[in-house]
Regions:
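C-terminal motif of bacterial Sec signal peptides marking the signal peptidase cleavage site
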Residues: 14-16
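Residue-level signal for mature regions of secreted extracellular proteins and peptides
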Residues: 10-11
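Bacterial N-terminal signal peptides that target proteins for export
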Residues: 1-7
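A cross-kingdom marker for long, charged
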Residues: 20-60, 64-358
Length: 358
């Protein structure tokens, strides 16, 4: 009877989530055979070194489980907002690693991401531990919530001489980092969490506070005409470029960067940087350099109320960037405690600008 109840609960949760999250990602990315990789820089060497150290910490069986062919598009697309009980991952589960292996994985994450990015992954996993505790506390089944249910995988062997990909994720988190020598693409990247208020390191922390503060400051800087262009609706909407939207392009909406004063442009850049700063310094700087160059063609749109804090959807759309912040009602109905957030460069998902066969 309990098995039937658990199965029914997972089906009901999957059905509810699907109304909020869209389809599973499908990737059609034929890989070129003549990819030229520029000489590696110190960041690339450091990342590959950390990846090699993690792989050396594994048994032969574990290495077999964590490594996939670089052209494996099924694995490339294997990320989701769903917990693992609804959307099974492949690779190695964090909870199955020993202390030494987890330390090596943490070191790898610390090279791929910034300190801010590492902190975000830890906060999101802490939120999932809290969600697991709240779900199991009522006696019902849990669809594999918790920090043990986050997975690591590689497409291709880490190398400074040929492209490869690193994946880490689970419920509400997907890091998809494609590397080719000194270049990297972090698109697509899913962040967010539930609950967003967590106790971490002895302090109560709101996971997305920095990016929400930046968005609110930008919105407050707009004059009435600019604000009329920015505000697109009075209720939060769902992700537009979430899982299942590989290859999708969207028309920009909202107030255009070229209509902003210089101080307002900087405030818009702050919105973008709050998310992009989760990348390591090299790749965050490269992304922001491109964003600054194109800020006049970058748009900001807002859907929802200004209060309460965190209850509105917003989107930044530029030639090479789309950022989304999407509050969710699923759970206890509090929009401010559950968010699905996306970063994409639709021109370079999974490094397709360099890798795709023409």
């Amino acid at each position: 009877m309990r098995c039937s109840w658990e199965l029914l609960s997972l089906v009901l949760l999957a059905s509810a989530c699907s109304r909020f999250m869209g389809d599973q990602e499908k990737v059609d990315l034929p890989i070129r055979q003549d990819i030229k990789v520029d000489p590696a820089d110190p960041t690339a060497q450091k990342i590959v070194g950390a990846a090699d150290a993690f792989l050396r910490s594994l048994s032969d069986q574990q290495r077999k489980a964590v490594l996939f062919a670089f052209n494996d598009n099924s694995q490339r697309a294997k990320w989701s907002n769903f917990p693992n009980g609804i959307f099974p991952r492949s690779g190695l589960k964090r909870g199955d690693l020993n202390a030494q292996q987890n330390a090596a994985l943490d070191q790898l994450l610390a090279t791929v991401l910034s300190d801010k990015g590492v902190r975000n992954t830890r906060l999101q996993m802490a939120a999932d531990d809290a969600l697991k505790a709240s779900e199991s506390g009522g006696g019902g089944p849990s669809p594999n919530f918790g920090s043990a249910n986050y997975y690591v995988s590689f497409l291709g062997m880490p190398s400074t001489e040929h492209p490869w990909m690193f994946q880490f994720g689970g419920h509400h988190l997907a890091i998809n980092a494609t590397f080719a020598g000194p270049r990297a693409s972090f698109s697509p990247m899913l962040t967010g969490g539930q609950p967003l208020t967590v106790n971490y390191g002895g302090q109560k922390t709101y996971i997305t506070k920095e990016e929400l503060d930046a968005a609110r400051s930008f919105l407050a800087s707009l004059d009435p005409q600019q604000k009329a262009a920015a505000v697109r609706g009075n209720a939060a909407i769902q992700l537009v470029l979430g899982p299942g939207e590989y290859g999708t392009t969207i028309a920009p909406e909202g107030v255009r960067g070229s209509s902003l004063q210089e101080q307002q442009k900087q405030l818009l850049l702050n919105v973008i940087q709050a998310r992009v700063d989760q990348f390591n310094a090299r790749d965050a700087n490269a992304t922001m350099t491109e964003v600054r160059r194109e800020i006049g063609d970058t748009y900001f749109g807002w859907w929802g109320p200004e209060q309460p804090f965190g209850a509105a959807y917003y989107r930044v759309t530029g030639p090479h960037i789309v950022l989304e912040y999407s509050p969710q009602k699923l759970g206890n109905g509090d929009l401010t405690e559950h968010a699905h957030n996306m970063y994409r460069d639709p021109t370079n998902d999974y490094g397709s600008a360099w890798l795709k066969a023409r």
